């Protein structure tokens, strides 16, 4: 019953802001009315640009996600006022290699100036391949939380901060100072107990004697071994989508009727998913009810399971699957549709 309650709630709820509700607030609407509202957000854009410039000038490893060059000149060499009103400085140009994205057209995509996206070492942006050493962004995110700065979210090698008019340069300078401090700790290979004291205290036996670079290397090697970035890409490419076997609504009804069974992740291969499964980030369903477990989705969740066991304290949030401990190891379990003969027996009241 508890799992069904959570399933029903998460199907119709989100942790993301509900923007129509925000827009309906009278005070919020008044603040954004007319020229004053546009000026507030222009100030936010300007602060975001200046923060990116500070990071480019003071950090060697953590970089803002913007073009390296614009018309042959460094991004940060232009005046802030010019950058703030010219989309060239936030534009994805086909053929450029600062991001390793592909399959888009001219003027199709732009970086949102109010989303301060930073990248960490570990993936060569020019070819999309893993480098020998990397700093998974979740380690940086935990360091920032330890020091009172909460990022919006992080992925394999990127971390995101949402900028609003509530952010002033003092806050952004504090963020930059922490980024610089993290890089110094990384270069000095500081003891993990100093960098992430909360996680170290919770898992002292596991991380005894660890340094920051040692943790980064171990997590980076895990991602590279499973080629997790490629799995992420494949999960959202049409040619790799899970095969549909049932109407999603019918699969959900089967779940509500109890015509399902909870199985270990390896045993789910080839079975029909009864729940949508979602790792956060990216916060997007990778398999939906009625689809067949397998392929990139199954391999991705298997990699996450290995990471949960290998590196405690860094588990991502998972929805639609369940972490259960057996024989000292945490395992991922999920609900799948029972075979038809088992469902018939269930309807007849037979014991299964």
Language model regions located:
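Active-site PLP attachment segment
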Residues: 1-8, 13-27
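Functionally constrained cores in energy, signaling, and assembly domains
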Residues: 12, 20, 32, 286, ...
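Short glycine/serine- and small hydrophobic-enriched flexible loop segments
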Residues: 26-34
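Non-catalytic terminal extensions of PLP-dependent enzymes
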Residues: 35-352
């Amino acid at each position: 019953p508890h799992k069904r309650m959570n399933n029903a709630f998460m199907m119709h709820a989100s942790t993301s802001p509900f923007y129509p509700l925000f827009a309906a607030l009278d005070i919020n609407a008044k603040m954004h009315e007319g020229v004053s509202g546009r000026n507030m957000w222009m100030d936010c854009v300007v602060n975001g640009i200046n923060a990116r410039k500070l990071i480019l000038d003071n950090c060697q490893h953590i970089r803002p996600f913007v073009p390296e060059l614009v018309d042959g000149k460094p991004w940060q060499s232009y005046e802030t006022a010019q950058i703030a009103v010219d989309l060239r400085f936030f534009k994805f140009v086909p053929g450029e290699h600062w991001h390793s994205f592909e399959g888009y057209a001219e003027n199709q995509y732009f970086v949102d100036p109010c989303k301060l996206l930073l990248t960490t070492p570990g993936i060569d942006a020019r070819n999309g391949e893993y480098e020998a050493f990397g700093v998974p962004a979740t380690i940086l995110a935990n360091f920032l939380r330890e020091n009172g700065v909460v990022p919006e979210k992080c992925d394999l090698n990127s971390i995101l901060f949402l900028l609003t008019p509530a952010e002033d340069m003092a806050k952004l300078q504090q963020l930059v100072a922490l980024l610089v401090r993290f890089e110094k700790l990384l270069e000095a290979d500081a003891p993990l107990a100093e960098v992430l004291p909360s996680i170290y205290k919770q898992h002292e036996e596991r991380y005894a004697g660890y340094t920051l670079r040692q943790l980064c290397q171990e997590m980076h090697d895990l991602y590279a071994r499973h080629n997790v970035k490629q799995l992420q890409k494949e999960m959202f490419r049409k040619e790799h989508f899970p095969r549909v076997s049932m109407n999603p609504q019918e699969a959900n009804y089967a779940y509500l009727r109890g015509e399902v069974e909870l199985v270990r992740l390896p045993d789910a291969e080839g079975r029909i998913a009864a729940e949508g499964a979602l790792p956060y980030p990216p916060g997007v369903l990778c398999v939906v009810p009625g689809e067949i477990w397998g392929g990139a989705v199954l391999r991705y969740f298997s990699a996450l399971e290995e990471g949960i066991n290998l590196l405690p304290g860094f588990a991502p949030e998972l929805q639609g699957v369940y972490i259960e401990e057996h024989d000292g190891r945490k395992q991922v379990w999920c609900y799948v549709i029972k075979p038809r003969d088992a469902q018939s027996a269930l309807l007849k009241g037979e014991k299964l």
